Structure formats: C-alpha cells, structure tokens
C-alpha cells in the first residue's frame, strides 16, 4: 500500500468500521429485544392467555416496523405543486391582475346611474339668475383705472387738504409726484376744469341742441358763402298716427318725398323737350340759308 492509502486508512478506517458495525448490530439488537419479550411474558402469564401475549408481541413488532419505516421516510420530502409559487414575482402579478380584471357589480351599476343622471340636469335659465350675480358676470376689467389714495381716486383729492406735502420739501423732485409736466398749481386748475366739465356734460341736452340748430338751418357756416336752405315743415300726420311718424324734426314726411321726385322727373322732361325744340329751329334755319345761297 502507498503512503496516501495508509494515511486515508489511518484517518477514516475507524469511522467506517464503526458505521458498518452499527448498521449490522442495529437490526440484531432489535430482534433480540423482540424475541426476549415473549419469553419473559411466557413465564409470567398462564397458559390460557398465551394468545393475548402473542397478539401483543405481534403489535409490538408491527409498531417497531412502523417506527423504522417512519424514521426512514422522515428523511424523504415530497413536494407536489398544486398552486402558484409565492416565491416568484410573476405569481404575485398574476394574482393582482386577476383581482383588478374583475369589476364588482356595484361599481358598474353606480357608473351607469351616474351616466343616466347627466340627462336629468336642468339647464339654468337666464331669468333664474339673481341680478347681483348678473352684474358680477357683466363687470369688465378697467384697463386704465384711476390711482387710489386712502380709498379715493386721486383726481378727487385736493392737494391743499393733505397734511404732508413732500413735493414742497427742499431738494424734492416734483416729477416724482406730478406727471405730464404738472405742478401743484396747474394740477389744481386741471381738477377744477374736469369737475366743471363733468357737471355740464349731458349727451341728451347736446343732441337736442343739434336737432334745434338743424331745424332752424343754422348748422351751415354763414361765412362760407353757401345759401342757407329753408327746410319745409312737414304737414301734420294723419289721424290715428303718432306725431313722430314722419321722422325726426327737420325731415319731410315720407309722402312728400314721392311728390318731390315726381316733380323733378317732370321738370327734367320739360328741359329735354325745350332742347329738342331748339335743335329743330336750328335745322330749319340752316335749310333756309342753304336755299337762299342756291338762288
């Protein structure tokens, strides 16, 4: 034998021999124990109970065999795959997808009811909106608002009322307080003029004055050399019609317009007839002159 074999035998021979001896002695010891028990029982038990002793011995043999088989079977593990493997990620995804794919009937009914309820909404009528809300909706944005000072527009504040006048301090730049070249004096004049104009401005009054001037024929400039046209007053309206049926003052009644047009047409026809007569006279004179020349 080589030195390596001797070393292996020296290292592992005792363990292998002990394992072999243990395997050989194990079943022999069990048989000896099983064989000794019925002998002991045979001496102590009377002859009439020998069947019971034998049955007990057979039960013990079967139990020992079952123990041996259970010990041998305990080392074997059998795994049967009956479901999804929870140790894998795909199984979790499949479970989640299976849960999300199914929709409960309650939610579907609720969604159908919500869609059906859309047609039941009644549109809001214009008259049902309160006037305050209508005013808020109609409000527009002022792009050029007046500046505010203490909650009042700056054009309504008199500079003389202010306690502090920083523009009067020495070294102050007046353009920081007055724009567009104003100073304190000119700003006061501007405010008084604006107040006077707002009081006198009345669009209805201005329109009535213009209509009166048009009716009197004073709208044309007398220095321009154009003659002032005398407006013809319209006749009174027929019975049962409002007084303004003919139009605004200074304009003729609708029936008079047709008469004026007819008069203009007839005058134009007369002018054409007169021109034709003159042409005929000229032709006759020319013919007479030609005859005299021949003679």
Curated annotation (Swiss-Prot):
Keywords: mRNA processing, Nucleus. This is Pre-mRNA polyadenylation factor FIP1. InterPro entries: Fip1_dom (IPR007854), Pre-mRNA_3'-end_processing_reg (IPR051187). Pre-mRNA polyadenylation factor that directly interacts with poly(A) polymerase. It comes from the Eukaryota. Residues 1-18, 63-76 have a biased composition (Acidic residues). The lineage of its organism: Eukaryota, Fungi, Dikarya, Ascomycota, Saccharomycotina. The keyword Ion transport does not apply.
């Amino acid at each position: 034998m080589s030195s390596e074999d001797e070393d292996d035998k020296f290292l592992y021979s005792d363990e292998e021999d002990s394992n072999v001896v243990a395997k050989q002695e194990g079943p022999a010891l069990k048989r000896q124990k099983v064989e000794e028990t019925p002998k002991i029982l045979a001496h102590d038990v009377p002859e009439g109970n020998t069947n019971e002793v034998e049955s007990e011995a057979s039960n013990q043999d079967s139990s020992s065999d079952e123990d041996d088989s259970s010990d041998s079977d305990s080392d074997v593990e059998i795994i049967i795959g009956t479901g999804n493997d929870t140790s894998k990620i795909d199984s979790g995804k499949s479970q989640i997808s299976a849960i999300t794919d199914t929709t409960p009937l309650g939610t579907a009914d609720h969604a159908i009811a919500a869609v059906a309820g859309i047609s039941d909404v009644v549109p809001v009528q214009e008259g049902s909106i309160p006037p305050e809300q209508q005013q808020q909706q109609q409000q527009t944005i002022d792009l050029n608002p007046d500046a505010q000072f203490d909650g009042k527009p700056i054009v309504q504040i008199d500079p003389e009322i202010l306690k502090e006048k920083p523009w009067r301090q020495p070294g102050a730049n007046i353009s920081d307080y007055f724009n567009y070249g104003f100073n304190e004096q000119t700003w006061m004049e501007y405010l008084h003029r604006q107040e006077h104009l707002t009081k006198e401005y009345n669009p209805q009054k201005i329109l009535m004055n213009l209509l009166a001037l048009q009716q009197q024929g004073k709208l044309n400039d007398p220095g321009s050399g154009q003659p002032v046209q005398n407006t013809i007053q319209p006749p009174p309206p027929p019975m049962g019609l409002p007084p303004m049926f003919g139009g605004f003052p200074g304009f003729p009644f609708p029936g008079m317009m047709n008469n004026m047009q007819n008069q203009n047409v007839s005058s134009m026809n007369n002018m054409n007839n007169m021109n034709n007569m003159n042409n005929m006279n000229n032709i006759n004179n020319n013919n007479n002159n030609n005859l005299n020349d021949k003679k």
